[in-house]
């Protein structure tokens, strides 16, 4: 019983996370870029049609 409740809770949490990522990656990913910019990172949307997951990555510029 405990395992079933745990799995259900994890599924509900993960579906909420994916819904938030879809919102961030709609409209060309501008919300993802803005969201990640708060942490001085670059927002990249990827997944099916480029709108399933917003990922914040650190941008390192090479110095010449």
Curated annotation (Swiss-Prot):
Disulfide bonds join 25-45, 32-54, 36-56. One of its GO terms (cellular component) is extracellular region. It is found in: Secreted. One of its GO terms (molecular function) is toxin activity. Keywords: Disulfide bond, Ion channel impairing toxin, Neurotoxin, Secreted, Signal, Toxin. Residues 1-19 form the signal peptide. Expressed by the venom gland. It comes from the Eukaryota. This is Putative neurotoxin-G. It comes from Lychas mucronatus.
